[in-house]
């Protein structure tokens, strides 16, 4: 019975660590995606203008 209590306590600590570490990681990832998409568009446009200026 003593081993079961230790295992239960370890499982509770493990779950609390996972829950507390998962919440902050979700917010920056959600905020990083629109920034990555917004920064990709001007690079594509600049690349197109460079290609057109080389042709003309």
Curated annotation (Swiss-Prot):
Instruction: Write down which residues bear the modification named Leucine amide.
Output: 55
What would changing residue 51 to L do, according to UniProt? 1.25-fold decrease in potency
Record keywords, A-Z: Amidation, Ion channel impairing toxin, Neurotoxin, Presynaptic neurotoxin, Secreted, Signal, Toxin, Voltage-gated sodium channel impairing toxin
Which residues are assigned to the propeptide feature? 23-42
Q: Name one GO cellular component term.
A: host cell presynaptic membrane
What result follows from mutating residue 53 to A?
Complete loss of potency
Residues annotated as transmembrane? none
| Consequence of substituting residue 55 to S | 10-fold decrease in potency
The consequence of residue 45 to I is: Complete loss of potency
Q: In which tissues is it expressed?
A: Expressed by the venom gland.
Q: What outcome follows a substitution of residue 50 to N?
A: Complete loss of potency
Q: Where in the cell is it found?
A: Secreted
Substituting residue 45 to L results in: Complete loss of potency
**Signal is among the record's keywords:** yes
Result, substituting residue 45 to G: Complete loss of potency
- Write the signal peptide boundaries: 1-22
**What else does UniProt say about it?**
Negative results: does not or very slightly inactivate hNav1.4/SCN4A and hNav1.5/SCN5A sodium channels.
State its role.
Inhibits sodium channels (Nav) inactivation. Shows two types of inhibitory activities on channels. Inhibition of hNav1.6/SCN8A shows a large increase in the steady-state current component without any increase in the slow component, whereas inhibition of hNav1.1/SCN1A, hNav1.2/SCN2A, hNav1.3/SCN3A and hNav1.7/SCN9A shows a large increase in the slow component with only a small steady-state component. Is 5-fold less potent than beta-PMTX for inducing repetitive action potentials in lobster neuromuscular junctions.
What is this protein's record name?
A: Alpha-pompilidotoxin
